[in-house]
Amino acid sequence: MVRPEPPESPTYTQSSRLQAAGLTEAIALLARAAEQVPLPAPPQPIVVADYGAANGHNSLRPMSEAIAVLRRRTRHDHAILVAHTDIPDNDFGALFHTLDDDPDSYLHKDPASFVSAIGRSFYGQILPSKTVNLGWSSWATQWLSRVPCEFGDHVHVAYSADGAARAAYADQAALDWHNFVAFRGRELAPQGRLVVLTLAVDDDGDVGFATLLDAIAGALDDQARDGLLRRDELRRMTIPTVGRSETDLRAPFAPSGRIEGLTIDHLETFAAEDRFWARFQGDEDADAFGAQWAAFARAALFPTLVHALDGGVEDPRAAEFVGQLEAAVAGRLASAPEPMRMSLALASLVKGP
């Protein structure tokens, strides 16, 4: 849900890219994993997998830091192959432009690093068995592989009163997480490691982001009332993300503590900082606070909603829909600023010998 600010943002700086929630802690864990994994002998490349790469901005710093650690452990010309993966509809052109153009790209820092991309869902096996030395996934596994059912009273199932829908989403979330870790267990080389940053729930089972999601739901209702959206389109509009508890995250490993040779080396959940709120406390600019969260929602969440239009991304109303929705969400959040509650889970998984 939360990604670093794009370069065209008026508040974008070199330092702000790392501030996507939880990345600092996750990158530190990834660097430790890079120190620990066994390395293949040259000329066999070291394989690093980035599961859920999106446009690449969240991958720049983690991949660069992991590659720097790996490079210190091997020859200067030992090839490091990075496989960026995402669903087929991902904008891989944007990903490759990020890797080519951004000064923080590992391609500019390590001449023996090489890039590849895979346009398939990571809820199946997408890389050969026993080939991945180091894996990374941030802000990706909270997205479900499919929408299990419709519900009409909110844009997010966590805030729906439809008990059957909530149960269906929970079942899908359990299946997806099981498949994700099982197939990574197959892909990882012996003693390979995978670091995952994803949405969690707090001690009360709350996924967070309530004010943002309520603002989106309210703005969509207004669009339907005003005639921009049809009621059947509104009913289809859902954001299929989930937060998982520590119990949920451990479930695939029960009762033996392993799945496909994979075990949990580290697992924690924590409350993440709302950096926009921290900024607001300094400048008290409510309009900027609302605009920043709305811009993030536009980048991370609105594309999913656009697909629910009768014409999908080609619908002639798509641009107007997104523009109006962003403005309405910004206005709602600016009218009553409050910190966004969010919980994250950070895990390091290791393959047995």
How should each PLM-predicted stretch be described?
Residues 130, 176-183, 187, 252:
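Short, conserved SAM-binding segment of the class I
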Residues 134:
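Short, Asp-centered acidic motifs that coordinate Mg2+ and/or phosphate
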Residues 22-25, 172-176, 241-245:
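Soluble or luminal CAZymes and related metallo-dependent hydrolases
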